[in-house]
Design a protein with these regions (language model features):
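Glycine-rich phosphate-binding loops of nucleotide-dependent enzymes
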Residues: 2-249
């Protein structure tokens, strides 16, 4: 029998043999992945690869088969609310803000389970420091903001829950490159403060530019995994997702 790995080497999120889908349509096939504490892991692949389905299964929003462990605990019997309470929080594709509520009201919704008023006030100030645009817009209706500002609000709302793991779905979708770069820089700062990130992205270059490790998903299966730098230099990944990078500087 092998010895238990030291605590620092254990995964915060461990997924093994995950199958999931919708009704009779199977989308995921034997998906396995690990996310260790205080790292950014990218799950990349094209539209329809199954990445969002994977997040929904991990969040217990859809039924699945296989093993999911978070912080050493099985999620087999967990509800979506249980998962949120454990500190596994999702930033959904399309932001899904409360459009007719103010920015600050949206942020407070992220802290709806919390009862520490002083801590919530402190975290609101922290979110406004991380995302200065939100401080300017705190009383504005969330639905009236630009796409980039809405993505900032969605990320800040998730952080108000004080997550251990933040799963971000298609952060770059529909955003200008300069806004994507700003959000990626912010994600790195968040990771450096101890929040683990699982980033699901079609923009492979953007995701791998900030990730420590990555996985490539195609038609519901993991087809490649490794360090972000190794995936960036993989000829098959370059050909399929990064275009002609020959001679790039």
């Amino acid at each position: 029998m092998t010895a238990e790995p030291p605590q620092s080497d254990r995964s915060l999120l461990h997924v093994s043999g995950l199958d999931a889908g919708y009704g009779e349509m199977q989308v995921l096939r034997k998906v396995s992945l690990d996310v260790r504490p205080a790292e950014i892991v990218a799950m990349v692949g094209g539209n329809g690869a199954g990445k969002t389905t994977m997040l929904r299964a991990i969040s217990r929003l859809i039924p699945s088969r296989g093993k999911i462990h978070f912080n050493g605990r099985s999620l087999a019997r967990a509800t979506a609310d249980d998962v949120f309470a454990m500190g596994l929080v999702q930033v959904p594709e399309g932001r899904q803000l409360f459009d007719r509520m103010s920015v600050e009201e949206n942020l407070r919704m992220g802290a709806y389970r919390r009862r520490d008023a002083d801590g919530i006030a402190h975290d609101l100030d922290r979110m406004y420091a991380i995302f200065p645009k939100l401080a300017e817009r705190r009383s504005q209706l969330a639905g009236s903001m630009s796409g980039g500002e809405q993505q900032m609000c969605a990320m800040a709302r998730a952080l108000m829950a004080r997550p251990r793991l933040m799963m971000v779905d298609e952060m770059s979708l529909g955003l200008a490159p300069v806004i994507v770069d700003l959000l990626l820089d912010t994600m790195t700062k968040i990771r450096n403060e101890g929040v683990t990130v699982l980033l699901v992205e079609q923009d492979v270059h953007a995701a791998l530019s900030v990730a420590d490790r990555g996985y490539v998903m195609e038609t519901g299966e993991i087809v490649r995994e490794g360090s972000a730098r190794a995936l960036e230099s993989d000829p098959e990944v370059q050909r399929a997702y990064l275009g002609d990078v020959t001679g790039a500087t």
